[in-house]
């Protein structure tokens, strides 16, 4: 993706902003953020930034708003490149503009579909098809990377950002494709392979051979080195922590967490005695209106104490910062450009961040640091390694 982005945009420097230890599907990442940042740097990224956890495990809308606000705040970004199943920027832009405007006809069809029991994604597709009389737009909205791309475009428009968008068409496999292909497989397929490996002290040779056709050598080497030392991590590793949170929360307080509706809160309370694991509970709570990923994100928000009030405060105060996870030593000119042009704080050392941040941004960073410490504690317990706090982690230099 990085090399193709350079070709498409003509850029010679690339800043990657990525989820930290928790990702948008509402689960912990299989590999830690530092391992994945190292991969990105080995494969051509100049600088890797961490998207705060309140955005990284949020809906596509908030995920995109968070990412674009950071990139726009750097003041030195001239292009944004994202992958999409559609690959047609004109089509994605036209849908983004329509959804931003939310004309009366669209809102009417959306509300009608929601009242008829459709989930929000399905209702939005149906409303768009009704309004345009064309199934193509709703087909575009049925693919997750298209949805995220549209949200990036909406966020750029909302911020009146000068950043120029580009999109790369995802080839060979879709986001939800769980089978490996000869040339290029989805992250879901690679994740499935890793999570289905029986307990083993080393990454099995046959799996390494399979993955060598899918991943660059540096990325595969990191997985091999980290295997059974700090990865793989899965949602069920957090089951006991989540069960404690669900049992300790009174019924009336669950709705304060981001994405937890009254309907979902009631289902959690009614079914929490049947809790066996994180994944099992998501499946148990799932309905036609409540998708698995929506439930998974909601439970993660409860676990990490991310509230709706937090999100409103972050949005209302337009608070943001750029936390650097790593950089290439020969691309320090990018760091200088960020320092010279950024309108948001650049965080390199957590211990020195307090004086740079507003109260809301400080809470956002502390929330992210707590979430990473929780992730690290799970790794420490699962693999029997010493705990290393977020304060102790060093910036990766390649």
Where do the model's predicted regions map?
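Non-catalytic positions within long, well-ordered alpha-helices that form the structural scaffold/packing
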Residues: 6-7, 41, 68, 72-73
